[in-house]
Amino acid sequence: MAANDVPCCETMFWVYLLVCVALVVFAGLMSGLTLGLMSLSIVELEVMIKAGEPHDRKNAEKILPLVKNQHLLLCTLLIGNALAMEALPIFVDSLLPAWGAILISVTLILAFGEIIPQAVCSRYGLSIGAKLSFLVRLIIIVFFPLSYPISKLLDLLLGKRHSTLLGRAELKSLVYMHGNEAGKGGELTHDETTIISGALDMSQKSAKDAMTPVSQIFSLDINFKLDEKTMGLIASAGHSRIPIYSVNPNVIIGFILVKNLIKVRPEDETSIRDLPIRRMPKVDLNLPLYDILNIFQTGRSHMAAVVGTKNHTNTNTPVHEKSINGSPNKDANVFLSIPALNSSETSHQSPIRYIDSISDEDEEVIGIITLEDVMEELIQEEIYDETDQYVELHKRITINMPMSGNSPETATWASELASPISPYRSSLLSPSIMISTLLRSPINSPYRHSLLLRPTLHASPPAQSPSILSPDSNNERYYYLSPSRVLRKSYEKLSRSNGS
């Protein structure tokens, strides 16, 4: 067609003008939808469907079937955009001179066919794509004979779906960016980002990263007697579970629960051999922490022995250990058979391996791992206990637990004798009373606001009522009061105060 073939203001002129406007609008829709729909990943839409806002969920449900076949959608939109852009100069050339047709067509296509539609659809691509999903389906049907063969060729060359999942490092960076500490408007707190990062890192950590070496654990020989000195060491250690070994600390055969010692009287000097020794699972040195956590979740034990090959482990612990009383062990080469190791797990086959009284020749215990160790790796922070002394294993830095207002170090004691660190206490109180003080719950500790102390573990015979330790204000010595006498004194004091 030559220039000015259609006279101005005639019917065909308006028809051609409407066609040009329609082509510009159609090209703009195709360009905007190409950017808006193709920028939405399948994973992002699935997340919106499961956890998005109600209106976003509806929009994602409409768009997801279209985006699943990405190559077909891409070919359809590009073919429609190309046809509109190629047809527009033909109709504009019928209305304007050549130079005017080039200027107007380039301006219309650039402004209204590319820049504005892509800017709007990049911002509101989800809502616009959902509202125009019916039109997109109609266009796919119209251009299906052209777009389908090209899309199948792209599927063959590039693959049907492109991976949009993030790796672990990318997820950690994404979580950190969503934290409020990053300053980008995220809602995740420091604890949330730390725990999520710890959960992602735990799959790459094994038992050797969280265990406590054998040389640093508190354990007892099975031949030890539970006298006052042993009970004092157990109380000062502050552990709820204590590993038990046979002669050599590397030959761990099980563990005992400290709460089971509440009925043990130190004057009886009960042997550890006579106590119920629980079986301890054994885990490989390179076993992932998640597998260890699954073992702990079974409820059979919250402590496991970490074993390694003797050729790859080197422990400096001597074979002949001295007992608490100072006498060396005589049966250094004898392995003990413990009848108390029987448990409910022996009645059926279990995939969990346990430490036996006789270990494998190529294996030896190199450390202990507990549920607390695994949880510390998960939250990436130390779990402080009210009795332990803390040493960071990897950096060898002593960590002091911050004192609270209720801690014994900051409390006001009724007298110098009431404090467990008093220099007068060791000379006036027997070791049994000292042990009971160490085992006393901090809730019932002898602070000034509480005069009643928790009964000792062994000071009273079974047939007698538990004694209560009370300070004498006159001579600062301790004597025993029965519960009835304490209540009677309190009642008399209350009566005098009411009478006055």
From Swiss-Prot:
Pfam families referenced in this protein's UniProt entry, alphabetically: CNNM
Domain CBS: 211-275, 276-319, 326-386
UniProt-annotated location(s): Membrane
Transmembrane segments: 13-33, 72-92, 96-116, 138-158
Disulfide feature: none
Topology in the lipid bilayer: Multi-pass membrane protein
Glycosylation sites: N311, N342
Extracellular side: 1-12, 93-95, 159-500
GO cellular component terms, semicolon-separated: membrane
Cytoplasmic side: 34-71, 117-137
Domain CNNM transmembrane: 9-192
Superkingdom, taxonomy of origin: Eukaryota
Official protein name in the record: DUF21 domain-containing protein At5g52790
Keyword vocabulary terms for this entry: CBS domain, Glycoprotein, Membrane, Repeat, Transmembrane, Transmembrane helix
GO biological process: magnesium ion homeostasis
